[in-house]
From Swiss-Prot:
Domain of life: Eukaryota
Record field: transmembrane: none
UniProt protein name: cAMP-dependent protein kinase catalytic subunit
Organism: Dictyostelium discoideum
A GO-annotated cellular component: cytosol
Gene: pkaC
């Protein structure tokens, strides 16, 4: 049996989402901005430009700002005129390159955005160099013709610069984008690798904890089996000195089978475990594909949580107590002494019997073959024997042997002396919230186990629940149990506990057991079922109507659980969803239940029945007595139903 700790009614699954905020190194650059050359320093957002006036103004401003030209003497001769023009022309060209470099929008883009990478300095040679003006000396008589020649290349410069600007501006931006993308990818890969390493380390730690839990649970399970005196377990070899004593069982459930076992006095501390620090120090192997999507990581984390919760409780072993049928049924029946009838049904009775050899007590279910055939219960009876002989669970009654004679079928069960839950519920009128929760939790574990075996119980009610001497539940009467892969259409069960899909003959499956659990919890807390009437068809109508009236003082969490279990739509019913019984176990009404401890029966139940001795039957109601074994028929008698129960 495995435990799983999700939260579905809580419905919560933890997931890890990787958030990698992108660092935008272009945050200072406007998305769509047109830069043009203006008369000031740097680009402006204006659309038009006057080249002639700006050029003349720049030349005039440069000349006026020059310290050498502030007090320059007037031209007195042609030679002085040429010398002055040559000096002014060189000065203008030098200032032109400097001003145009500073006015370039590309200069401001790089200067403003590349500062984040450190102390970046724009090289002095980085400029949009215009074509050099014509420096040929001309006669003094043509000064007015030279001035238009100087203005003409200056008019062509903005056009050439505007053509070169987009190409040169795009190249550094593309390089920066590529560098940033590479850095972001590297950061993402590093983060993903770190998360994968952490997940693998957590998985290793969880596996170590699970292994330790499984070892402890196996030891405790073996100790429990030793105490019950059921299996023959050899003494285990240990590092410390142990003493082994062989004893004969006196357990009332198994001593009639004449089994012996060896008790080994070992403790959990004697078992050697590998140190956790050594296991955690082992190198971890990274995944071959470390880059995964957040959706994939969420799915993996959900699957891991489900597996961890399901692996907390080990699966129960196969029923190793079941014995093959005896060679001679009549001789086998002579070994038992009939005490009294403790239960009755439509086609049979249940007897308390005692083994005459060792004095142990059992419950014998006797069924008349003719009645079984007349009521068309052959398939159900064969299914009950087949299922109980192949399963074992702490909260399901154990079947030890099945055999038949010429007229009857016999099922040998363990005797549960605490009586039926139905009897105790009628005496106390109703159970407390804690008592009902304890019984319901053990039933949830039993149903979870059965459903994993594809077994539908279909007859959950207080009459089929027994209480043992430690106060724990034992589910009995598997007459309606059936292995179902998908759906079945047989109409069977108790009217007050039938699910709507059974009444409507739509086909039913495992979801009907969760509906019956909701009815049972309501009845344990209220003292009566939610859908009750003297007329069977009136009960069916109330079930289909789905109106539930809760009494005053009903627990709020229990009310919410019952409403979720008693959902008419089986596709939305709690327990029948994707996570199955895990949704029921994660409901807040069961928040204080330790499922692993409950499965291992570490604590006694809330109610310990009064049992004077092993064969005490005072907790069962009185029934009319009837002989368990009939007289053998004549030697010429031929069993007409032998072919129907050949595998019994």
């Amino acid at each position: 049996m495995s435990n799983s700790n999700n939260n579905s009614s809580s419905g919560n699954h933890n997931s890890t989402t990787i958030n990698n905020p992108k660092v935008n190194v272009y945050s200072n650059i406007p998305n769509s901005t047109t830069y043009t050359y203006g008369s000031g320093g740097g680009g402006t957002l204006s659309g038009n430009n006057t080249n002639n006036n700006n050029t003349n103004n720049n030349n005039n401003n440069n000349n006026n700002s020059s310290g050498d030209n502030k007090n320059h003497s007037p031209v007195t001769s042609a030679t002085d005129r040429l010398t002055k023009m040559d000096i002014e022309e060189k000065w203008d060209n030098k200032n032109y390159e400097k001003d145009e470099r500073e006015k370039s929008p590309l200069f401001h883009i790089l200067a403003s955005n590349l500062n984040s990478f450190g102390n970046f300095k724009v090289p002095s040679t980085f400029s949009l160099t215009p074509p050099e003006p014509n420096k040929q000396q001309q006669p003094q008589q043509q000064p007015q013709q030279q001035q238009p020649q100087q203005q003409q290349p200056q008019q062509q410069q903005p056009q050439q610069q505007q053509q070169q600007q987009p190409q040169q501006q795009q190249q550094p931006q593309q390089q920066l984008q590529q560098n940033n993308q590479q850095q972001q990818q590297q950061l993402q890969q590093q983060q993903l690798q770190q998360q994968l390493q952490q997940q693998q380390q957590q998985q290793q730690q969880q596996q170590q904890q699970q292994q330790q839990k499984q070892q402890k649970q196996q030891q405790q399970q073996q100790q429990h089996l030793h105490q019950d005196g059921i299996v023959n377990t050899p003494s285990t070899t240990q590092t410390s000195t142990t003493t082994t004593t062989t004893t004969t069982t006196t357990n009332p459930h198994t001593s009639g089978l004449s089994l012996q076992h060896a008790h080994s006095s070992y403790t959990p501390s004697n078992v050697l475990h590998s140190p956790t620090h050594f296991q955690s120090s082992l190198p971890t192997r990274l995944d071959t594909n470390p880059i995964t999507t957040p959706i994939r990581q969420q799915q993996q984390s959900q699957q891991q949580l489900q597996q961890q919760q399901l692996q907390q409780i080990p699966p129960p072993t196969v029923n190793s107590f079941f014995l093959p049928p005896p060679v001679n049924a009549r001789e086998r029946l002579k070994e038992f002494k009939q005490i009294r009838v403790i239960g009755t049904g439509t086609f049979g009775k249940v007897y308390l019997i005692q083994n005459t050899k060792d004095g142990c007590y059992y419950a014998m279910k006797c069924l008349n073959k003719a009645y079984v055939v007349q009521l068309k219960q052959v398939e159900h009876l064969n299914s009950e024997k087949s299922i109980l002989s192949s399963i074992h669970h702490p909260f399901i009654v154990n079947l030890y042997q099945a055999f038949q004679d010429e007229k009857k079928l016999y099922l040998l069960f363990e005797y549960v002396a605490g009586g039926e839950v139905f009897t105790h519920l009628r005496k106390s009128m109703k159970f407390s919230n804690s008592t009902a929760k304890f019984y319901a939790a053990e039933i949830v574990l039993a149903l979870e186990f059965l459903h994993k075996q594809n077994i539908v119980y279909r007859d959950l009610k207080p009459e089929n629940l027994l209480i043992d001497n430690q106060g724990h539940i034992k589910i009995t009467d598997f007459g309606f149990a059936k292995r179902v892969e998908d759906r079945t259409f047989t109409l069977c069960g108790t009217p007050e506990y039938l699910a709507p899909e059974i009444i409507q003959s739509k086909g039913h499956g495992k979801a009907v057991d969760w509906w019956a659990l909701g009815i049972l919890i309501f009845e344990m807390l209220a003292g009566y079922p939610p859908f009750y009437d003297d007329d069977t068809f009136a009960i069916y109508n109330k079930i289909l109507a789905g109106r539930i009236t809760f009494p005053l003082g009903f627990d709020v969490d229990a009310k919410d659980l019952i409403k979720r279990l008693l959902t008419a739509d089986r596709t939305r019913r709690l327990g029948a969803l994707k996570d199955g019984a895990l949704d029921v176990k994660n409901h807040r009404w069961f928040s204080d239940i330790n499922w692993e401890r409950l499965y291992q029966r570490r604590d006694n139940g809330p109610f310990i029945p009064k049992i004077q001795h092993q064969g005490d039957s005072s907790n069962f109601e009185m029934y009319d007595e009837e002989e368990m074994v009939e007289e053998p028929p004549s030697s010429n008698y031929v069993d007409p139903y032998a072919h129907l129960f050949k595998d019994f």
